[in-house]
């Protein structure tokens, strides 16, 4: 059986890939971008590049979401890359509330659906419920042939959330 398929989200085609923003935290603080991020071509949807916003801008209408094109050198990603990609993007709550400090993962489950057929992948991370600093972040990853190749869910905690969210 294979007639139920999760399609690429509409956000995939609402902006040109050239409008996406290279993930780079050095605007926040020089040297802040982790080395493992620098090994990855990661282009974030322009609506989700919270680190490029002015500090006084309102995040009220922003989604708790982060979408990106991902590519590592070496060709088509394997299952290890898919697992790595399932927790690679910034916490989605930063797009909604701005930088919040440490947001550790408590649990993470990744499902490898199939091996990708393209070297570039598209990831869409979203959260819909935040309660007392805890939230679940769902991720779906597609290859550019529109095959869902991996999905994940993680339970995450915003530390000192009452300072930023209440």
Language model features with spans:
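Terminal targeting signals and extreme-terminal segments of soluble enzymes
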Residues: 1-166
């Amino acid at each position: 059986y294979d007639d139920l398929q999760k399609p690429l989200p509409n956000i995939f085609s609402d902006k040109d890939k050239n409008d996406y923003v290279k993930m780079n935290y050095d605007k926040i603080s020089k040297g802040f971008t982790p080395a493992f991020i620098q090994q990855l071509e990661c282009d974030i949807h322009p609506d989700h590049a919270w680190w490029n916003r002015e500090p006084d801008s309102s995040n009220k209408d922003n989604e708790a979401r982060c979408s990106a094109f991902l590519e590592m050198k070496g060709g088509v990603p394997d299952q290890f890359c898919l697992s790595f990609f399932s927790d690679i993007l910034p916490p989605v709550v930063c797009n909604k509330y701005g930088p919040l400090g440490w947001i550790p993962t408590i649990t993470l489950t990744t499902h490898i659906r199939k091996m990708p057929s393209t070297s570039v992948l598209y990831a869409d991370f979203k959260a819909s419920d935040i309660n007392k600093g805890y939230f679940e972040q769902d991720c779906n990853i597609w290859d550019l042939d529109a095959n869902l190749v991996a999905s994940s869910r993680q339970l995450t905690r915003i530390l000192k959330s009452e300072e930023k969210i209440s």
